[in-house]
Structure formats: C-alpha cells, structure tokens
C-alpha cells in the first residue's frame, strides 16, 4: 500500500450500513491509496465510522481523484446555498 497521508476527523452524523440499519458516525478517515474495489489505480478513500462499535460499523467509499474533487465542490455549493445561521 502507498497511503500518502491518513487524515482522521471527528464527525457527528449518521450512516446507513449493510442491511439498511443506521448508526451514529463519530469519525471520518480519509486517505489516498490503492482501492479495494473501485476500478482505478488509486482512489481517495473515505471511511465513515464509529470506532467504539468495531470495524463493521463503517461505510467505506472509494472515489477517483476527479470524483472526490467534484464531491468537494458539490458539498461546498450545498452548504453555501443554505443560510449561514444554519451551517455555522
């Protein structure tokens, strides 16, 4: 593996896991590396997780660099469209 940096950030949200059950997400783990499933040489990988519940309590996403940048732009656009008082 050739992970360049692993960035862990606290999160407060929910994720829908396998079987359709929802769980509280407390951590985001972001890193650029070889994917497990995506058909690309390298991907930006994001794990939405709750470490205290074990390794199964996570949703993993593998995105191409272009898709990751598009997602960043979409998140920024969505947040910017809401009133500042709502987004802090």
Question: Which sequence ranges carry the predicted segments?
Answer:
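Positively charged, low-complexity terminal tracts
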Residues: 1-88
């Amino acid at each position: 593996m050739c992970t360049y940096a692993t960035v862990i950030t606290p999160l407060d949200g929910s994720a829908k896991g396998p079987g359709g059950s929802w769980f509280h997400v407390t951590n985001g783990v972001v890193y650029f590396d070889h994917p497990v499933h995506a058909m690309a040489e390298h991907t930006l990988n994001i794990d939405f997780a709750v470490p205290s519940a074990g390794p199964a309590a996570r949703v993993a996403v593998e995105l191409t660099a272009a898709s990751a940048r598009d997602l960043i732009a979409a998140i920024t656009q969505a947040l910017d469209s809401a009133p500042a008082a709502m987004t802090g």
